[in-house]
Swiss-Prot record:
The protein, known as: Hydrogenase expression/formation protein HupG
Annotated source species: Bradyrhizobium diazoefficiens (strain JCM 10833 / BCRC 13528 / IAM 13628 / NBRC 14792 / USDA 110)
Pfam families reported for this sequence: HyaE
Membership in a protein family: Belongs to the HupG/HyaE family.
SUPFAM superfamilies: Thioredoxin-like
InterPro entries, sorted: NiFe-hyd_mat_HyaE (IPR010893), Thioredoxin-like_sf (IPR036249)
Length: 148
């Protein structure tokens, strides 16, 4: 599967493509392995150029967390349906899921330290009904120019 024609072949990083028909199987396999599933809803890399950056970072995050994460890319044709299911509002977004629970979302490209901090908190937080709040990280808009 090619993420962006002629540039990044994500299968070489062990990232499979999932769609509406295969996502539950992927999530179940991650649960069986004791890992947290990380789904990339990238969007069109021509519209969202940072999608390519997030796609490059995801395999690095998986490696950094030493087997605690399993990653996949959502097929473009199913991004809308699966985005609604998991609460995606912007693209690109990383979706963290364990045991049927959406643990959190990290949108857009972030500094490495932000990824490590937020993912560590998502992995370590308690699960269940008292911990149902998902963390969504969206960078704040910064105005440019002179303030008067």
């Amino acid at each position: 599967m090619e993420f962006q024609v002629g540039k990044h072949d994500l299968t070489r990083h062990g990232l499979n493509e999932v769609d509406a028909a295969t996502v539950d199987h992927f999530l179940g396999a991650a649960d069986e392995a004791g890992a947290i599933a990380v789904l990339l809803s990238a969007g069109d890399p021509n519209r969202f150029p940072e999608a390519t950056d997030v796609a490059v970072v995801l395999p690095e995050l998986i490696a950094a967390f030493g087997g605690r994460l399993r990653g996949a890319v959502i097929a473009r044709g199913d991004e809308s349906a699966l985005g609604q299911r998991f609460g995606v509002r912007v693209q690109p977004t990383l979706i963290f899921v364990a045991k049927g629970e959406t643990l959190g979302l990290i949108a857009k490209i972030q500094d490495w330290s932000v990824y490590v901090d937020r993912i560590t908190k998502l992995i370590d937080r308690p699960r269940g009904q008292s911990a149902a709040v998902a963390v969504t990280i969206v960078p704040q808009h910064r105005t440019q120019g002179v303030e008067l």
